[in-house]
Every structure is written in C-alpha cells, then in structure tokens.
Amino acid sequence: MSGKTKRLMVMAGGTGGHVFPGLAVAHHLMAQGWQVRWLGTADRMEASLVPQHGIEIDFIKISGLRGKGLMAQLTAPIRIYRAVRQAQKIMRDYQPDVVLGMGGYVSGPGGLAAWLCGVPVVLHEQNGIAGLTNRWLARIAKKVLQAFPGAFPNADVVGNPVRTDVLALPLPAVRLSGREGPIRVLVIGGSQGARILNQTLPLVAASLGEQITLWHQVGKGALPEVSQAYQQAGQAGHQVVEFIDDMAAAYAWADVVVCRSGALTVSEVAAAGLPAIFVPFQHKDRQQYWNALPLEKAGAAKIIEQPQFTATSVSSLLAGWDRATLLSMAERARSVAIPDATERVAAEVVAASKSA
C-alpha cells in the first residue's frame, strides 16, 4: 500500500456475535497493511479479548437501557452525550479513515461521533432483524451491510465473517461420505450454555440409545448437574464438557448440530456445512428465529421453538434422518453460506476510505 497507512476503527462490543466478526475483518485488513484500533467498553468481553489479538482498544462509558429503571431512562440522554464526547476525542486523536460498526452499545455513540468528525461509517448487521442501534445509525452511515436478507430493505447481503479454521474444513461430501456407526450429535448452547438443551438432551440420548453419540457443551458451571443427568439416564458414555475450545474440530466431528441460533452460530454452521436443529432464544423481536429461517427454507435445518423442544420431538427428528439425508442437508447448508464474508466487508471498508 503506497502513501499514508490507512486507519480503521472497529466499534464492537458486548458479545462474541459482535466481537468475533469484527476481529476477522480487522485481521484481514491488518494483513493488507491497515492500522486498526478498537472502540469498546471496559466491562465487557472486548476489553480483554481484543488486546489478545494485538489490537489496541479505547473505552467509552455506555450501557444498554433495556430492562433498566426509570432513573436510568431519565439520565440516558446525559450518559449518551458524555459517551459521544468521549468517542469524539478518541476519533480526533486517532484520525481513522473509516469506522466499522459491528454492533453492541458502543456503536451508537461511536458512530455518531465518527459522523460528527466527518469520518465515513460502514455498518454491518449480523442478525436477521436489525438492532435498535444499527437502525438508527443506518441513517448516517456511508454503507450498510447485512448478514441475512431482510434486516434492511436495500442493504447488500454479505454474510457474517467467521473464523478461518471453520472455513478451512473439508466440504460435506469429503467429510461425511463413508461415515458409519451412530449419528454424531454436537450440542452447543453457547459459551453460557442453554438450560433447555441441558435438560432435554440426556433424555434424547436415553430414547435413541446406540443410534446416536453426543458431544455436549453444557456451559459454565453446569457440568456436574448435566453429567449426573446423563448418568441417571443410563447414558454416561457421551462426551459432556463445560466448554469446547476448538469449535472447528467439533464441527468436523459432527453429523448434525443442536444449538441456539445466534447470528454467528448460524453462519458458522452454514460455513461448516452441517445440518442443524435450531432452538431460537425467546426474545421479543424473535431475532434468532429470523437468523435460522434461511437455513430451514433451504432444507438444511429444522427450527423447534422452545415450548415445543421436547425429548420426543427431538428424538423423532433425529431418528428420521439417515446418513444420506444428513449429507444432503449438509450440502444445502454449505450452499447458502457466504464463505467470503470477511473479504466482502473488508472491501467495503476499503471502498469507503477511497471515497471519503
């Protein structure tokens, strides 16, 4: 890259669904010679995770309003104003060429500060239903991108950036052809686990017996209780762990996955080429349902809403899927994936920097 080194500021915080896609784009652009800095909050996961990736991070003080009391609502304008002023100072000191908003509370004040400083804002919405912050920022953004169709009416669909080790997995036809033995069921409730999965899957294991074998991530603190549930069901032989560090290896092992349908999980399942049973988290805007719907429409997954997620319903589904069916579903999942999402988002950042 000739001339002045281009500078990007990534705004993302709160959850892995915002932070990990931001890191993927950051690393891609750093490899192209860009300088990258991060805007986050000091009390969320980005505070420790981002520096581990060799990226400096600045903090502003901001938190969400949903579920907060009246006093928090009344003082919100003051807190937002202060956060915007903090972000403006950071922008002036760093002087980024582009700001990339990947979601989380930090994106609101950060995006407004960038706009006030004349810095182009590129937004990426990871979910099938746009969050409040991104809906507001879309009015001032130079470019709006979405992972799934429908979050914004006219935004480009670019997918969600996912980890390179997941993208590097062999295609389903290579990975799954010739497999024999019990169906391998990977159960993921996210790093915090999901109680409904932990309660139900031991009963599914008991129902299907030797037809399946499970690798079950139960989440922090749930291992003793869930292990005991498997033992009481006479199913102590399954692999039950608190957390899976190498998700790519878990995807490579699995024939089918049972999980929530957070945006990043859905995108990773598609990129890996895996059939899925999705259990959307019951949020008022049904965000996770809309994330999972494209894969169900493609014939790659089934959505079971939480009230209907029982040992009987799950056992019936799994028992009806033979290996040929699972391979077909896996190939359909892969066909709707957008494996070059990282490159697509990065290209829009580069384009915004040139037209600034």
Curated annotation (Swiss-Prot):
Pathway: Cell wall biogenesis; peptidoglycan biosynthesis. It holds the Pfam family Glyco_transf_28. It is found in: Cell inner membrane. Keywords: Cell cycle, Cell division, Cell inner membrane, Cell membrane, Cell shape, Cell wall biogenesis/degradation, Glycosyltransferase, Membrane, Peptidoglycan synthesis, Transferase. Its EC number is 2.4.1.227. Signal peptide: none annotated. SUPFAM superfamilies: UDP-Glycosyltransferase/glycogen phosphorylase. GO terms for cellular component: plasma membrane. InterPro entries: GlcNAc_MurG, Glyco_trans_28_C, GlycoTrans_28_N. It is a peripheral membrane protein. Cell wall formation. Catalyzes the transfer of a GlcNAc subunit on undecaprenyl-pyrophosphoryl-MurNAc-pentapeptide (lipid intermediate I) to form undecaprenyl-pyrophosphoryl-MurNAc-(pentapeptide)GlcNAc (lipid intermediate II). One of its GO terms (molecular function) is undecaprenyldiphospho-muramoylpentapeptide beta-N-acetylglucosaminyltransferase activity. GO terms for biological process: carbohydrate metabolic process; cell division; cell wall organization; lipid glycosylation; peptidoglycan biosynthetic process; regulation of cell shape. This is UDP-N-acetylglucosamine--N-acetylmuramyl-(pentapeptide) pyrophosphoryl-undecaprenol N-acetylglucosamine transferase. Belongs to the glycosyltransferase 28 family. MurG subfamily. UDP-N-acetyl-alpha-D-glucosamine binds at residues 15-17, 127, 163, 191, 244, 263-268, 288. It catalyses: di-trans,octa-cis-undecaprenyl diphospho-N-acetyl-alpha-D-muramoyl-L-alanyl-D-glutamyl-meso-2,6-diaminopimeloyl-D-alanyl-D-alanine + UDP-N-acetyl-alpha-D-glucosamine = di-trans,octa-cis-undecaprenyl diphospho-[N-acetyl-alpha-D-glucosaminyl-(1->4)]-N-acetyl-alpha-D-muramoyl-L-alanyl-D-glutamyl-meso-2,6-diaminopimeloyl-D-alanyl-D-alanine + UDP + H(+). The keyword Metal-binding does not apply.
